[in-house]
Amino acid sequence: MGGKWSKRSVVGWPAVR
């Protein structure tokens, strides 16, 4: 949780879903 979205979590919240 946060490993793949380490960069996306900042500007990829909608991209995670």
From Swiss-Prot:
A lipid is attached at residue 2 (N-myristoyl glycine). It is found in: Host cell membrane; Host cytoplasm, Host perinuclear region; Virion; Secreted. It comes from the Viruses. The virion-associated Nef proteins are cleaved by the viral protease to release the soluble C-terminal core protein. Nef is probably cleaved concomitantly with viral structural proteins on maturation of virus particles. Phosphorylated on serine residues, probably by host PKC. GO terms for cellular component: extracellular region; host cell perinuclear region of cytoplasm; host cell plasma membrane; membrane; virion component. Its main location: host cell. Keywords: AIDS, Apoptosis, Early protein, Host cell membrane, Host cytoplasm, Host membrane, Host-virus interaction, Lipoprotein, Membrane, Myristate, Phosphoprotein, Secreted, Viral immunoevasion, Virion, Virulence. Residues 2-17 are annotated as: N-terminal. It is a lipid-anchor. InterPro entries: HIV-1_Nef_anchor_sf. HIV-1 lineages are divided in three main groups, M (for Major), O (for Outlier), and N (for New, or Non-M, Non-O). The vast majority of strains found worldwide belong to the group M. Group O seems to be endemic to and largely confined to Cameroon and neighboring countries in West Central Africa, where these viruses represent a small minority of HIV-1 strains. The group N is represented by a limited number of isolates from Cameroonian persons. The group M is further subdivided in 9 clades or subtypes (A to D, F to H, J and K). Homodimer. Interacts with Nef associated p21-activated kinase (PAK2); this interaction activates PAK2. Associates with the Nef-MHC-I-AP1 complex; this complex is required for MHC-I internalization. Interacts (via C-terminus) with host PI3-kinase (via C-terminus). Interacts with host PACS1; this interaction seems to be weak. Interacts with host PACS2. Interacts with host LCK and MAPK3; these interactions inhibit the kinase activity of the latter. Interacts with host ATP6V1H; this interaction may play a role in CD4 endocytosis. Belongs to the lentivirus primate group Nef protein family. Factor of infectivity and pathogenicity, required for optimal virus replication. Alters numerous pathways of T-lymphocyte function and down-regulates immunity surface molecules in order to evade host defense and increase viral infectivity. Alters the functionality of other immunity cells, like dendritic cells, monocytes/macrophages and NK cells. One of the earliest and most abundantly expressed viral proteins. The N-terminal domain is composed of the N-myristoyl glycine and of a cluster of positively charged amino acids. It is required for inner plasma membrane targeting of Nef and virion incorporation, and thereby for infectivity. This domain is also involved in binding to p53. The SH3-binding domain constituted of PxxP motifs mediates binding to several Src family proteins thereby regulating their tyrosine kinase activity. The same motifs also mediates the association with MAPK3, PI3-kinase and TCR-zeta. This is Protein Nef. It comes from Human immunodeficiency virus type 1 group M subtype B (isolate JH32).
